A protein has these predicted regions:
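Juxtamembrane extracytoplasmic/periplasmic/luminal helical "stalk" adjacent to the first N-terminal
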Residues: 19-107
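Short N-terminal helix-loop-first-beta-strand/juxtamembrane motif that initiates sensory/input modules
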Residues: 61-97, 127-148, 233-255
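Well-ordered, non-membrane alpha-helical segments in soluble/globular domains
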Residues: 114-125, 296
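Extracytoplasmic/periplasmic ligand-binding sensor regions of membrane-associated signaling proteins
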Residues: 138-221
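Solvent-exposed, extracytoplasmic
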Residues: 120-131, 203-204, 208-251
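Extreme N-terminal signal-anchor transmembrane helix of membrane signaling/transducer proteins, especially
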Residues: 2-40, 299, 306-309
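Cytoplasm-proximal transmembrane signaling helix
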Residues: 282-327
Length: 327
């Protein structure tokens, strides 16, 4: 005689439903755990970069102070006869020298004092930048005569100057006007710009400016265009970095992670300054990242859920109800 099953019609169905729900919860927890690890990894990388950026700014703060002393030191002046000056335009002059990686350009009148100043700055920056294989530039706006001096390591500067005008020379007047405007800001002696990109060489840099006031003359401004390619961690994209002033509402110096619209924004204060480093990640990028790194896990879980559904429906239809199907 057939013995009636002790299982009620919906018991086994509910067991498999609970099993499927458990698989879904496990999948969601795994994805959330990866998301948390992703956020922590990005924040740790940003913290590391902000620390290195703070050291870099401190270094250039010292270099700027030392450069200002060199520019105003009249005791050690190189011989003007040794300077070879090439006129690029009526107001742009290139100083050729023995330096292999540094170029000096004077914007303004071809005066001996300006050429000597450019030579001294180039010789000093050769020591600072000579061993670095990266893009860096320095603009020195002399408060005595409003002369602008450019010292740069740009690798293609000489060919551009010989055959066509460089973007560095074309933007000189804009640089001068910008530096003159910022020199009138009495409440700000130090200014850091947002991160910019030079697309032809895929270079990311920011501008660091320091103002120096001396009695009897206009403000002298030293401006560095500093490359950060060597500071960017491998798991971060330079296109998504920004530098802005620290909000007044931020009372602590701790890093923060916040959602603004569909963007996840990581932030970390730059020690020794009133600025903050930000990194933006879009929701779309996070979704693709999470799915891409968990594709096989999700595939396996979905296959298990699919087979569990098939078995649950088969048992409910064939083995539980009606009992006559079991004969």
């Amino acid at each position: 005689m057939y013995k009636q099953s002790l299982l009620k019609p919906n018991t086994l169905f509910r067991i498999f439903a609970a099993f499927i729900l458990l698989l879904i919860v496990m999948l969601c927890l795994s994805l959330f755990n990866y998301y948390q690890a992703l956020v922590q990894s990005r924040q740790a990388s940003l913290n590391s970069m902000a620390s290195r950026l703070a050291y870099q700014i401190e270094d250039y703060r010292y270099q700027a102070s030392h450069i200002y002393k060199i520019a105003n030191n009249k005791s050690s002046t190189p011989s003007a006869d040794q300077l070879a000056v090439t006129g690029i335009r009526h107001d742009i002059f290139w100083l050729s020298s023995a330096n292999q990686s540094i170029d000096a350009i004077v914007f303004g009148n071809n005066k001996q004092s300006s050429n000597v100043l450019a030579s001294k700055l180039a010789n000093y920056m050769e020591i600072v930048w000579g061993a670095r294989n990266e893009y860096n530039s320095m603009y020195y706006l002399n408060g005595l005569d409003n002369t602008l001096v450019l010292v740069t390591t740009h690798s293609i500067l000489k060919p551009e100057l010989r055959f066509k005008e460089s973007y560095l020379t074309l933007t000189a007047e804009e640089k001068r006007a910008d530096m003159l405007t910022q020199s009138t800001l009495l409440d700000r002696r130090e200014i850091i710009s947002n991160i910019q990109k030079y697309s032809p060489d895929n270079l990311f840099y920011y501008t660091y400016r320091l103002m120096f006031n001396s009695p009897g003359q206009l403000t002298s401004v030293i401006s560095f265009d500093i490359s950060i390619n060597s500071l960017i961690p491998p798991n971060l994209n330079g296109d998504f970095f920004t530098i802005n002033t620290r909000p007044a509402s931020t009372g602590s110096n701790e890093p923060h992670t916040t959602w603004v619209g569909t963007n996840l924004i990581f932030s970390h204060p730059i020690d020794g300054t009133s600025y903050q480093l930000y990194y933006h990640v879009s929701l779309k990028s996070i979704i693709f990242n999470v799915i891409g790194y968990n594709l096989w896990l999700m595939t396996g879980m979905l296959i298990m859920i699919f087979f569990a559904l098939l078995i649950m429906l088969f048992i409910r239809k064939r083995l539980i109800s009606p009992n006559t199907n079991m004969l």
